[in-house]
């Protein structure tokens, strides 16, 4: 996906990028590749691949959810900033918090935010399991997002405690999401969430399947969740 295709395919979905926003994506790409030489941020470094599999793929969430309001967003395990930084570039009014367990990635994101001149972006070096227990962030976000971090039964325990009641947890998944949903239904129920919508589409050019799950927070999450670091992965909430 070249830059012109990136721009026109977003335009088709009602997302018009200014020359400044396109410049920000260019700076993002250059900074990602430069830092990737000294630390492992991504296996994808070829320009057209980055624009398709990282930038465009991140923004697809906005094809199925309206980001036009100044929502507070928490991105769990964003790694090199996906999906929240591409969304922030497209929708500058969003208030973004990224939580990642690796300090080196947080250093990269701080540097990136300065280079992109982003405001209303904050980064936290923490495990999602401990972050989700903290006062002031628990059940504080309009939207919590995660892209390809863990299977749904595990991911729900990391993300739903952070979503305010009435807010949305957006899980961005690859193929075979139906099986994950089946295994994750019980966890959603326990944690106060309910699957509202699942959208399946093909990523252009390479035609690989993507699924976006919109999960509504219906009730408060029981205080015992999230459990201590590592437990959600070892003992997921499954029947």
From Swiss-Prot:
Locations listed in the record: Cytoplasm
EC code: 2.1.1.-
Binding-site positions, S-adenosyl-L-methionine: 77, 82, 128-129, 147
GO CC term, one of those recorded: cytosol
Gene Ontology MF terms: rRNA (guanine-N7-)-methyltransferase activity
Main enzyme class: transferase
Keyword match S-adenosyl-L-methionine: yes
Superkingdom in the source lineage: Bacteria
Keywords: Cytoplasm, Methyltransferase, rRNA processing, S-adenosyl-L-methionine, Transferase
InterPro entries: rRNA_ssu_MeTfrase_G, SAM-dependent_MTases_sf
Function comment: Specifically methylates the N7 position of guanine in position 535 of 16S rRNA.
Family: Belongs to the methyltransferase superfamily. RNA methyltransferase RsmG family.
NCBIfam families per record: rsmG_gidB (TIGR00138)
The name this protein goes by in its record: Ribosomal RNA small subunit methyltransferase G
Source organism of this protein record: Bacillus mycoides (strain KBAB4) (Bacillus weihenstephanensis)
């Amino acid at each position: 996906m070249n830059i012109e295709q990136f721009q026109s395919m977003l335009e088709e979905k009602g997302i018009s990028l200014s020359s400044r926003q396109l410049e920000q994506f260019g700076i993002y790409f250059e900074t990602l590749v430069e830092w990737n030489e000294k630390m492992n941020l991504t296996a994808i470094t070829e320009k057209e691949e980055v624009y398709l599999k990282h930038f465009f793929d991140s923004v697809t969430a906005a094809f199925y959810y309206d980001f036009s309001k100044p929502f507070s967003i928490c991105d769990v395990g964003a790694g090199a900033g996906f999906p929240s930084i591409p969304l922030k570039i497209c929708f500058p009014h969003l208030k973004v918090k990224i939580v990642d367990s690796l300090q080196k990635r947080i250093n990269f994101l701080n540097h990136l935010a300065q280079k992109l001149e982003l405001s209303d972006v904050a980064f936290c070096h923490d495990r999602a399991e401990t972050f989700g227990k903290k006062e002031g962030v628990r059940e504080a976000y309009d939207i919590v997002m995660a892209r390809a971090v863990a299977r749904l039964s595990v991911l729900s325990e990391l993300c739903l405690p952070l979503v305010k009641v009435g807010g949305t947890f957006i899980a961005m998944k690859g193929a075979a999401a139906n099986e994950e949903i089946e295994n994750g239904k019980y966890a959603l129920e326990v944690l106060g969430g309910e699957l509202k919508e699942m959208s399946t589409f093909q990523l252009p050019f390479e035609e690989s399947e993507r699924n976006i799950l919109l999960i509504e927070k219906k009730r408060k999450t029981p205080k015992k969740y999230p459990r201590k670091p590592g437990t959600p992965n070892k003992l997921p909430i499954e029947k």
